[in-house]
């Protein structure tokens, strides 16, 4: 069973199915009905783990709905920042980058360039 990672930024929703650290098919959506788009992605295949990083306000009802379509929902929020001892001023997308880099480069120094839509 695959996992689904989703990043909702200021400009668009980006998502990818993945198996471990290997990314699969990726998606980009720029409409207003983000929850509906996510639900359409999981109609045919239920993700084991769904990871959500969002700089937009995602209601608790939407979070609850997402928890119903996967085995485990991980939301990059203040609790996750505390768990990884990250500063509270980090946005969820940047925090996800730091957590991933720590996993991929365990015990090594690492510099992360995360420019979002700056370029």
Label each region the model flagged.
Residues 1-24, 101, 107-119:
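Gly/Thr-rich phosphate-binding beta-strand-loop-beta motif of the actin/hexokinase/Hsp70
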Residues 16-32, 83-87:
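Glycine-rich phosphate-binding "P-loop"
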Residues 31-34, 56-58:
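Short beta->alpha connector loops
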Residues 35-44:
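Short amphipathic alpha-helix with an adjacent loop that forms part of the alpha/beta core around
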Residues 39, 63-64, 98:
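Short amphipathic alpha-helical segments and helix-helix/interface helices
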Residues 44-92:
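Short beta-strand-loop/turn "lid" adjacent to the catalytic site in phosphate-handling enzymes
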Residues 58, 96-100, 119:
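A general structural signal for short secondary-structure boundary/capping elements
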Residues 82-112:
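Conserved phosphate-binding catalytic cores of ATP/NTP-utilizing and phosphoryl-transfer enzymes
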